[in-house]
Every structure is written in C-alpha cells, then in structure tokens.
C-alpha cells in the first residue's frame, strides 16, 4: 500500500509529513518502480472489488482473505513501558524521533518511564497512544508487509480515528500531532468546567438504559446541578455500552443499578465525560485547528465514529470529525458496517495496532467469525 499511496496521491502537499512519506523513507532501499506499479494496481483492484456488488463484476474476484483491515485504539489504553518492544524497528524509532521534533519534548521517555500520573494526563495520553499505534505499524510492515500492501479499510476508536486518518494519508503526521494537542487541551479544559465521569455498563434485554439515564439526569437537575447530562457515550457490543455524564448522575445510576436492572457498572480511568455535550466547549478550538490543515481524501476507507460510515472525501472529514467530540462513538455500528458481507464470503484479516487488545476482544463479541482472522500488534 505504500506504493499505491505514492501513485494515487501524487503529488503530495509540499512540506506535509504523511505516513507514506516517512514510512516509505524507512523502507525505500528495497522499492522498485515495477513493484510500485504492481502493488498500486493490485490495491486499486482490491478497493474496486469491495465497492461493487459481486454479481456486477466482470473480472475474477479477489479473495477477501487476501485483504486486511486496521483498527486503532483510543485513550485509556496507555501504560508505562508502552512502545518498548517496538524500538528494535528503525521505522518505529524514527516515528518517535519525528514526534519529539514536532512536540519539542521527549514523548518516548514519557511512554517508557512515566510516571503513570504524567502519562495518564490527557495531553500526553492521547499523543502517546497515537504515536505508539503508528509505530506498531512499522512492526507490522517489517514482519507482515503484505498486510500493509493489501489494506483496504481502517477505523479507530475515538482518538484512534485520527490515527486511522493519518494512516490513510488524509491527515499529515506532523499536523495530526498538533491537532491532537489542541484536542486534548480543549477536552481537559471542558473536563475542568464540569466534573464528569464514564462507566462501562453491562445490562440485559429487560433493561431500559435510556430511561435510567433520563432519570439520572433529572435527579441531577432536581439537586441543582447546572445543565446536567447523562447518556450513552460509546456503543461497544450487544448489552454493553459506556454511559457518561456528570459525576452525580453516574453516582445515582450506581446506587440504583439494581432497580434499573443494570447488571454491572465499572468506572473508566478518564477525567471527564467524553463524547457527550459536556465536551461542547472543546469543539470550537478543535474545529479551528482542523481548518488550518489541508486534508486529503483517504486512500483507503476510513470509518467515522459519528455514524459508522466511511468518510466520502476530505470535506466530509472537516464537517464530521469535530462532531465526534460531543457525539457517541458508534463502534458496534462501525464493526457491523465494516464486516457485513454475504453468507459464504470470507472475512479480511484484521490487525489491531497499538496498546492493548480491547478492540479485537470487542470484535469477538460483535462478529465472532470476523474475529477468527484477527491479530494484535501491541505497542
């Protein structure tokens, strides 16, 4: 896919630091012109195969098992010592060097040494996860280059969506670093304005989670909480969602879980109610920063958290990505959209690149057959 990117997205923006640029620089010693053309044509055929109904194709279909899909994790997956095993790959080391040059501080040192409190701060955690995920791609490129060459789609959870856009050459790497800095700072400021929380929530078919959230929100209002909110922030898998809102609202749900037939609630280690209206103040600075970036059409399908559908073009990214800050992450819907196919049609290989194994575990609960061909490239 490196070759395809060069041909399909040429010329690149002058001065932009795209994933294909720095990744191909790390591997260009073995690249030949004939291979570029062959890989580009093959990749374009893969994309065409996926975009046309099978009965309308006039050429032999490419086996879906020969294609790949990338998934990228979000904030909360970071841990002290992350990326240590990636440093044996020159490309991964170069990614961190470039990040340090742009950020003007040693992000890798924070990943490796912490302390945990520093790494978990939103302004560091989001950058650490994104850069480590891109570094994990370098391990994949070294060990299974075909997975990169035949990749036809990508998606990322929350912050991971920005990682996916970098991977798809829609967003330059250096600009993405600055954008994530703005995003993290603005989201932390929103957290400071209203104390919020998030909780993984397991429930049964007899649970009315919407009513429970509405009751919690009304309870906050009655108690004098200003402009309270409680609602679904992440759609994970059947009978599992992340609920977020004011701290008081989640405390109400936890105390009354049995009466609402909620089976379990587990608080997430985050500083606010992400992907809810409580983050509204973060939208404007993020949108302003995004407008300064010259976006490109993704060279592969990248799915939006907002509606679970692929981005259509660069302008679509500009309008859709800011909404993600205050809208629920529709991850379950995204997985259905990505892996929906006719009976008997094989699934692509799926690679989760970044810290943790959570996205593959969720895929197992949403589509067990698709998960049989999934792999982790752990940062």
From Swiss-Prot:
Pathway connected to this protein: Lipid metabolism; fatty acid biosynthesis
The organism's place on the tree of life at top rank: Eukaryota
EC number(s) stated in the UniProt entry for this protein: 2.3.1.39
Keyword set includes Transferase: yes
Transit peptide: 1-23
Main location, first listed in the record: mitochondrion
Keyword Mitochondrion (UniProt): yes
Compartments (UniProt record): Mitochondrion
Active site (record annotation): 158, 275
Alphabetized InterPro entries for the sequence: Ac_transferase_dom_sf (IPR001227), Acyl_transferase_dom (IPR014043), Acyl_Trfase/lysoPLipase (IPR016035), Malonyl_transacylase_ACP-bd (IPR016036), Mitochondrial_malonyltrans (IPR052760)
Disruption phenotype: Eggs have a thin shell.
GO molecular function terms listed in the Swiss-Prot or TrEMBL record: [acyl-carrier-protein] S-malonyltransferase activity
GO-annotated biological processes: fatty acid biosynthetic process
Family matches, as PANTHER family: MALONYL-COA ACP TRANSACYLASE, ACP-BINDING, MALONYL-COA:ACP TRANSACYLASE (MAT) DOMAIN-CONTAINING PROTEIN
Family membership: Belongs to the type II malonyltransferase family.
UniProt protein name: Probable malonyl-CoA-acyl carrier protein transacylase, mitochondrial
